């Protein structure tokens, strides 16, 4: 299948306010001669109270989720519903913080014949599974140097192929948003017959842009990790773990800093560590001031 014939299958999720991201990803896709459709992402703060009552559960609204997370989940679910009602058999869905390389669509085009093969029964194929649980249990098929199989604990919805059958399964299981959509997909993978695949090598790259799910935060830690190009570690530290009343976010970095502060007060008694933690916590929370 040529890239021109894939245009109706390729969707990029992008918030209207994130014009810089759209410009960057448009340039990247044009460089690789890939046509796509833009999906105007659902902005969580704009969803109605009626939508929240019908589609977001109590724990999510009060303890686990923020508006960005709810909007992200709503955007993906809307595209899954659109796929089911379309004539297409699969969608290739990208969030706007990814980057293609010269081999991305060469490999994607070679994946497509496997989507209709009952031997593999693919529901969902993650194109950028980079978290620490993404190792595949065993190789089921190979394309060039890329080995494909079912991962142990995959996360991320930054880029993936989903079949119509897979979209039906996800929507049957995810009636209400309860947490990050990639965690919900992970639970479905564990407790159902949902066939989730990924590869041993990322097919697209995650950029080091600020997350649009959590609130933007400039800290010494984030500046240092950006300088080192530790993109996934930075994303992991800044992703919100839980949120109080959709606003006050607690992420991994905050928890680690609080633990460091406790350890320092009990054992190390180091003034530099103390003031470093205080400064980082201030930078993390100045958005609320």
Give the location of each predicted region:
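An acidic/histidine-cluster motif and surrounding catalytic segment
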Residues: 2-94, 98-289
């Amino acid at each position: 299948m040529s890239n021109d014939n894939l245009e109706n299958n390729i969707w990029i999720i992008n918030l209207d306010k994130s014009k810089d991201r759209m410009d960057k990803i448009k340039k990247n896709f044009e460089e690789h001669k890939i046509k796509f459709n833009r999906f105007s992402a659902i902005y969580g703060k704009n969803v109605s109270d009626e939508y929240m009552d019908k589609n977001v559960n109590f724990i999510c609204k009060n303890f686990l989720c923020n508006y960005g997370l709810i909007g992200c989940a709503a955007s993906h679910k809307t595209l899954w519903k659109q796929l089911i009602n379309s004539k297409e058999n699969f969608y290739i869905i990208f969030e706007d913080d990814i980057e293609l390389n010269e081999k991305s669509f060469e490999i994607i085009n070679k994946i497509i014949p496997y989507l209709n093969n009952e031997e593999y029964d693919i529901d969902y194929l993650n194109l950028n599974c980079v978290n620490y649980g993404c190792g595949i249990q065993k190789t089921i098929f190979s394309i060039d140097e890329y080995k494909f199989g079912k991962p142990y604990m995959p996360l991320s919805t930054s880029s993936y192929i989903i079949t119509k059958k897979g979209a039906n399964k996800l929507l049957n299981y995810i009636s209400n948003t309860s947490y990050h959509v990639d965690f919900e997909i992970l639970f479905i993978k564990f407790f159902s017959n949902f066939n989730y695949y990924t590869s041993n090598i990322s097919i697209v790259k995650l950029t080091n842009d600020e997350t649009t799910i959590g609130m933007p935060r400039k800290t010494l830690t984030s500046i240092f990790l950006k300088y080192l190009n530790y993109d996934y570690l930075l994303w992991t530290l800044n992703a919100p773990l839980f949120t109080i009343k959709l606003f006050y976010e607690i992420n991994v970095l905050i928890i680690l800093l609080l633990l460091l502060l406790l350890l320092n007060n009990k054992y190390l008694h180091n003034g530099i560590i103390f003031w470093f933690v205080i400064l980082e916590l201030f930078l993390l929370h100045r958005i609320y001031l």
